[in-house]
Each structure stands twice: as structure tokens, then as C-alpha cells.
Amino acid sequence: MAHPHLLAERISRLSSALEKGLYERSHAIRLCLLAALSGESVFLLGPPGIAKSLIARRLKFAFQRARAFEYLMTRFSTPEEVFGPLSIQALKDEGRYERLTTGYLPEAEIVFLDEIWKAGPAILNTLLTAINERHFRNGAFEEKIPMRLLVAASNELPEADSSLEALYDRMLIRLWLDKVQDKANFRSMLVSQQDESDNPVPASLQVSDEEYQQWQKDIGAISLPDPVFELIFTLRQQLDNLPNAPYVSDRRWKKAIRLLQASAFFSGRDAVAPIDLILLKDCLWYDAQSLNLMQQQLEILMTGHAWQQQAMLTRLGGIVQRRLQLQQQQSDKTAFTVIKEGGMFSRRPHYTLPPEASASTLTLLLQKPLKLHDMEVIHITFDRSALELWLTKGGEIRGKLNGIGFAQTLNMEVDNAQHPVVRDISLQGTRLALPGAAEDSMPAEIKQQLETLENDWRQQHTRFSEQQHCLFIHSDWLGRIEASLQDVGEQIRQAQQC
């Protein structure tokens, strides 16, 4: 078996070759390739003329000697046109009911059925068996069919509560396509002279029959780690609790997990990773409403839980709360305290300075910086006599901000715990402390918890960086996940700097 990273590189190059000359169809090609490599079915929804059939034709070139069958369904289509005509010779000579399947669906590896919902019951019933069991009953014999990929297409969804729902449920990947949107891509498409029938894939990249069969076994060996299963189960519970969520059968969940295993395998990994779960957005929707719902639920899962983003923010909130408690305790211990001297008949209490404040000029530190008179202030210098007068009689008090310039008027008061408090213009206040009493350093307990949290964040970010090289996931999702992790990291860094 090829080295996992070499296999991932080969599949990436194979996809690039298949995408050549197709504009704004890279994601569709990649998911159809993933479906083909894992033996699943795809439904393409979109208006006529947007290269749905060309996508299916291209996938034939991913394999060596692959045969393709395509058919446009009408309400008058017969099983003979899809599964092959009856053998008149066998019926006449031997009385056997047998179809001539050469060139028809039972002998094709790649199958494209356009306007699939117009198929009649006789075709649908046989098609269901072909998709489910990869077998076709031809007369008295059960024949194994080689189909690796079924691409069904339509410009509409099947009607609810119709006989078509069983077939729709078998189509694991569902893609909603639209016209080319980008101006440059539209121009390139108009002037392109590429022959659609040309094989764009070098022989060295094409998949042999032996490789395909071996890969089916290898895909089944990819593990589903417990944390990833928990994410899947969380998503399932969220969907079950939403009133407008689509019904997802157990069979569909099981087939979707195999697709995630294939994504991991062809990305060079031996286990399903959270990044693979993004593929579920193309597997679990039913209509336009549920498509938007799945996008929202997957985004919540990927940007909030898949790499512990919300859990880390919750831990950070607890650490910050604990730090505030410790700071309050420290503030009570280190705050500058005056002595209450109010007499029995005094209309207002008055205070005196403590013995340790004996200097003629007093510099008091703000326990947290405030913006006063358009200046970021960390300490204030008072004239001792002016401070004593204010404590005794009240009135105006002035001090030099950061010990410089002229003394400025201050909004100050003494709180119930006998601590002088200075306030800014928005009335945010902070207590004052004598130099040497204020404790600016972060408590060791908090510092250790923040360092542990930062290490956990780095581990999660490293996991994401290692797993994000997944061919089948659109880069927009990677950007949103990276932004969510960076937001958590920034909040942790801000907490460390406070």
C-alpha cells in the first residue's frame, strides 16, 4: 500500500486533473470523486446547462478502463432503455427471461441518470436494488454489478410523501449547484476550446481495479475516535430537538460515517477527525430549509465545540471570576485606610490619617489605572495638610496626577470600609494604596491556570493545523474555524496581560 501522504498527494493531483476546464465546480468534482472512491451515490440539484452531466463524464477518467452509462429519464422511459433489452434469442430458444446488458447500467462503473424523478416505478425498484446491494437480477440469475458511482441529477427535489423518497434517501451526497458566478470564470468558460470528451487524467494517476478493491477494505479500517463520535452524537441530538430538522435515518448516518472514513483515508489519516464532519452538511439535508439549517448547526459545532473552543472560553470565564475574587480580597488588604473620628453629635463623619502617613507629601497608588483629566493615571501626589483638611471638613480635594504638573481637582470619597476612592468621569472608581502595599502581580494560582489553558489552546490549534489539509473541505470553512480558535487565543492572551 502507498504511504498515506503519497496517496493523499496522488488523490489531490487526480482531482486537479478532473477539475481542469470546469469552472466553479471544484468542490462538486472533489465530492463526486470521494463518492466514487468509496462506492457511494450523489444527487446534483440545479438548473439545466450547468455541467451536471459533464461532471459525471469526467469521473469516468478517474479509473482505468471504466465504462460509463448515462441516460435522460422521461415519463415514458422503460427498463429496457436503462438495464438493457430482452434477449429474443434466449426467450425463443430456451424460454429464458434475460436482458442483454452490454453497454447498459448493469455493466457500467460510472452511471449518470438525468431528470431522475421522472423515472417510473419499474425502473425505480430495480435501481434501488442496484444501489443497495450492487446486484442485478437478470432472469434466473443474480449478477453482481460493478457500479462505483451513481450520479443522479434534476432541477427539482422529489415531492414529499412520494414513492421517490426511498431512492432519494439512497443518495448520500446532495449538492446544490448554480450557474457560474465569477466574472473572470464566466469569460474563461465562454472562450474555452477544450474538448469535453478528452481525457485530462494522466495514466499514472488513474485508479486500477486492484487499488479500488483494496481501498474499500482500507476505508473500513479507519477508526472513529471517541471525541469525534461525541461530536456526531451531539449533532444528532441537536437535530432531534429542532422542530424543523430533517429526518435522518440510521442507515443514512451509517453510510455518512463511511464517507467520513473515506475522507480521512484519502487525506492520509488513520482516524476520522473533526474536520471530516463538515462533509455531513452535504449528506443530511433534504430541502432548501434543511440545507440552511445544516449549515448553521455544523458551523456551531465546528466553531464552538470541535476543537474545544466553547469549553476553553468557559474555563477562561471561571479563571477570570476567580481572579476578580482574589483581587477583591487583595484590595481589601492593601487599600489605604483612614481612621474614622466622627463624634456623637457630628452631622457627618470625619477622618484622620493613619500614623504611617506622616510625610508632608503623600503619594498614593491607584489599585487600577484610571483616565483622569485626559491622562492615564497610576498614582496621585497629595499635600498632607490638604488631605487632612478634606478628611476633616470635606469640600474640594486636589492632587498631582502621576506626581507632575499642577494639582488637579479630584472626585474622591471615603467608602464604608474607610478606604479613599477616586472616580473618573464615568464614575468608575478605584481604591488608593500606599507605595509598597499595592500588589500588582498576578496571583500564582491564576497565572498557572492561564498557562495551562494556553497550553491546551496550543494543542487544539496544532491538532487543527495538522488536520486541516483535507481535499474535500472548502477553504471557507477552514477560515472560519481558524478565526474561532484565534479569538479564543486572543482572549486568553488578554487575560494574561491584565
Swiss-Prot record:
It is found in: Cytoplasm. Keywords: ATP-binding, Chaperone, Cytoplasm, Hydrolase, Nucleotide-binding. One of its GO terms (cellular component) is cytoplasm. It catalyses: ATP + H2O = ADP + phosphate + H(+). SMART domains: AAA. CDD domains: AAA. This is Regulatory ATPase RavA. The gene is ravA.
